[in-house]
């Protein structure tokens, strides 16, 4: 519920930052952000690369599209309505596809959303570079956990969790990840 106190706090943030939105759909915001992190932070970490490297590679972008579709399917199955954040809103009409033409449209959507962040290094990569455990189990792993409860298959989220866990466990380095992992993702035929 958005009450007068929340509106008062919003006004302070707007004055200080120039922009602040209120919502009572916290799960929608949470799952939009989780989807965002699952796609580009998860895959970037699994591949040991920057966002721009993904944007420049067709197969990596197909992985993003399939991973995003998994996230949107889970979000819908949970009855959650995503909220647009930073241009991203993981609804079925934006990130789901059945044909190659629709896949191309979804890739164009993700490309538009993420082009401003080409130089971004995922926070999970930064954690691993510092020798810290990353939050893979709370991002992609959260989608995997929810999917199991719902009977939904998540081969792309599963593979991202597997790859990042292997890197985290020292089985190979971030520098080796692109060459080792991109081909492990199986792109279905459309």
Each predicted region: which residue ranges?
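NAD(P)-dependent Rossmann-like dehydrogenase/reductase catalytic/cofactor-binding core
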Residues: 14, 62-190
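Internal alpha-helical scaffold of NAD(P)-dependent oxidoreductase catalytic cores
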Residues: 1-88
């Amino acid at each position: 519920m958005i009450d007068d106190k929340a509106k008062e706090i919003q006004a302070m943030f707007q004055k200080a930052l120039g922009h602040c939105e209120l919502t009572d759909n916290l799960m929608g915001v949470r799952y939009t952000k989780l989807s965002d992190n699952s796609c580009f932070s998860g895959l970037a970490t699994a591949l040991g690369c920057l966002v721009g490297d993904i944007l420049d590679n067709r197969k990596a972008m197909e992985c993003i599209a399939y991973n995003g579709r998994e996230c949107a399917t889970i979000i819908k199955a949970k009855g959650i309505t995503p909220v647009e954040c930073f241009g991203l809103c993981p609804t079925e009409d934006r990130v789901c596809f059945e044909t190659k033409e629709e896949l191309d449209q979804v890739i164009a959507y993700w490309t538009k959303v993420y082009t401003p962040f080409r130089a971004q290094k995922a926070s999970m990569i930064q954690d691993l570079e510092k020798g810290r455990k990353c939050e893979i189990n709370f991002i992609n792993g959260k989608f995997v956990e929810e999917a199991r409860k719902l009977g939904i298959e998540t081969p792309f989220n599963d593979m991202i969790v597997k790859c990042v866990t292997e890197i985290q466990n020292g089985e190979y380095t971030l520098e080796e990840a692109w060459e080792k992992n991109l081909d492990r993702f199986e792109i279905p035929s459309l």
